[in-house]
Amino acid sequence: MGKCVGVADTTFARVDMGSVAEEVLRRRLPGYRIVRHTVPGIKDLPGAAKRILSMGCEGVITLGWVGRREADKLSYLAASVGLIMVEVLTGKIVIDVTVHEDEAEAPEELAAIAVDRARKHAENLAALIREGPEALVKHAGMGLRQGYPDAGPIK
């Protein structure tokens, strides 16, 4: 099959974060095939991630959107636990990117958060695949943020 990396996203999301991640991964991982799997909602992401990794992909980025209701937040919790299980059981990289609809009131601000977060985490996934587990060590403790301005380190 050759080298591949996965993108799993949802139709529930209000921003096409999957395309943002795909663009970054194509640029940062030339020669890799990108497998994209779009599912209805956030609780479907663990299964999608597992299917992608079962195809021989080295890692996957999952892009979820959480609504404002309490039920949505509980669904996120279930999905998050599922994604952690996939990562632990497969031993492969799973980068969970999530936007919570109550992070901002204005749709434009939510869109900016989603795009920034998807882009930065896709960069993280590409670095981990290219350079291995020490790829992000140089950024440890630097207060980097995805979706917001970096906070910086506390010295």
From Swiss-Prot:
Where does this protein act, in terms of pathway?
Cofactor biosynthesis; riboflavin biosynthesis; riboflavin from 2-hydroxy-3-oxobutyl phosphate and 5-amino-6-(D-ribitylamino)uracil: step 2/2
Q: Output the SUPFAM superfamilies linked to this UniProt entry.
A: Lumazine synthase
The record lists the catalysed reaction(s) as: 2 6,7-dimethyl-8-(1-D-ribityl)lumazine + H(+) = 5-amino-6-(D-ribitylamino)uracil + riboflavin
Q: Name one GO molecular function term.
A: riboflavin synthase activity
One biological process GO term for this chain?
Answer: riboflavin biosynthetic process
Q: Which domain of life is it from?
A: Archaea
**Top EC class, one word:** transferase
Residue ranges of coiled coil: none
InterPro entries, alphabetically? LS/RS, LS/RS_sf, Ribfl_synth_arc
What's the EC number here? Answer: 2.5.1.9
Keywords of the record: Riboflavin biosynthesis, Transferase
Q: Name one GO cellular component term.
A: riboflavin synthase complex
Which family would the database say this protein is a member of? Belongs to the DMRL synthase family.
Name of the protein in question = Riboflavin synthase
Per the record, the gene is: ribC
